[in-house]
Amino acid sequence: MAEVTNIGLEVFGDMGKFKLWLYTPNFALGNLKPIDLLRDSYGKEMVIGELTRINYGILL
């Protein structure tokens, strides 16, 4: 979770904005909440991938 938090803070620049993103269903993640995907390593990688895409301006 620390890795995801660090990336999220880098992308959003604010813990409040990052938490809002974590708890909001995400179209690119199958309309799942990113927080719900952090239960296993596969989901964690999906969330990190989406944060990376957001950071580079690749939005779906």
Task: List each language-model region with its residue ranges.
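Non-transmembrane "mature" sequence context
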Residues: 1-60
